[in-house]
Amino acid sequence: MKVVLQRVSQASVTIEEQVVGQINKGFLLLVGICDDDTEADLDYLVKKISQLRVFEDEAGKMNLALGQVNGAILSVSQFTLYASTKKGNRPSFTDAGQPDYAQKMYNLFNQKLAATGIAVETGEFGADMQVALVNDGPVTILFDTRDN
């Protein structure tokens, strides 16, 4: 499982000119699922993301977690995180999870995030989406459960 986390001051996702998810301070998550991902991978990332201390405290040090700053999450599915560009100029997406499995895992991931008490907004799995954000910092962190 791969997640690109961006600390944002605001973010939104639009489908067919309608905003379907929107947050102010928090994390924009671009979420990629592969067929090897398990519920343990979800649990690992939920714990890491919910406890990640990348918000500034009163001393200006990145020391506060999302819940401590009343932040929210905008979670957007993104199979292109599993693009392979080893051959040619057209990416291959064969490492991305099969749609039914990936959607099930993506939905479960978002439910588990919400169960931590953090407000979670989402895009729509498989849709053509426009994502707008203001990256705060910038702070961008890559997670890959194959590396843990």
Curated annotation (Swiss-Prot):
Source species, domain of life? Bacteria
Annotated catalysed reactions: glycyl-tRNA(Ala) + H2O = tRNA(Ala) + glycine + H(+); a D-aminoacyl-tRNA + H2O = a tRNA + a D-alpha-amino acid + H(+)
Q: Where in the cell is it found?
A: Cytoplasm
| Pfam families recorded | Tyr_Deacylase
**Motif Gly-cisPro motif, important for rejection of L-amino acids in this chain:** 137-138
GO CC annotation terms, alphabetical: cytoplasm
Top enzyme category: hydrolase
- Which parts form a coiled-coil structure per UniProt? none
Provide the GO biological process annotations: D-amino acid catabolic process
SUPFAM superfamilies registered for this protein in UniProt: DTD-like
Q: Which Gene3D superfamilies match?
A: D-tyrosyl-tRNA(Tyr) deacylase
- GO MF terms, alphabetically ordered: D-tyrosyl-tRNA(Tyr) deacylase activity; Gly-tRNA(Ala) deacylase activity; Ser(Gly)-tRNA(Ala) hydrolase activity; tRNA binding
Q: Does the keyword Metal-binding apply?
A: no
| Keyword field | Cytoplasm, Hydrolase, RNA-binding, tRNA-binding
Its quaternary organisation is: Homodimer.
What NCBIfam families has UniProt attached to this entry?
Answer: D-aminoacyl-tRNA deacylase
Q: Which family does it belong to?
A: Belongs to the DTD family.
- Reported function: An aminoacyl-tRNA editing enzyme that deacylates mischarged D-aminoacyl-tRNAs. Also deacylates mischarged glycyl-tRNA(Ala), protecting cells against glycine mischarging by AlaRS. Acts via tRNA-based rather than protein-based catalysis; rejects L-amino acids rather than detecting D-amino acids in the active site. By recycling D-aminoacyl-tRNA to D-amino acids and free tRNA molecules, this enzyme counteracts the toxicity associated with the formation of D-aminoacyl-tRNA entities in vivo and helps enforce protein L-homochirality.
Q: Which PANTHER family match?
A: D-AMINOACYL-TRNA DEACYLASE 1, D-TYROSYL-TRNA TYR DEACYLASE
Q: Give the domain section of the comments.
A: A Gly-cisPro motif from one monomer fits into the active site of the other monomer to allow specific chiral rejection of L-amino acids.
Its recorded name reads D-aminoacyl-tRNA deacylase
**Which organism is this protein's natural source?**
Latilactobacillus sakei subsp. sakei (strain 23K) (Lactobacillus sakei subsp. sakei)
Q: Gene name, please? A: dtd
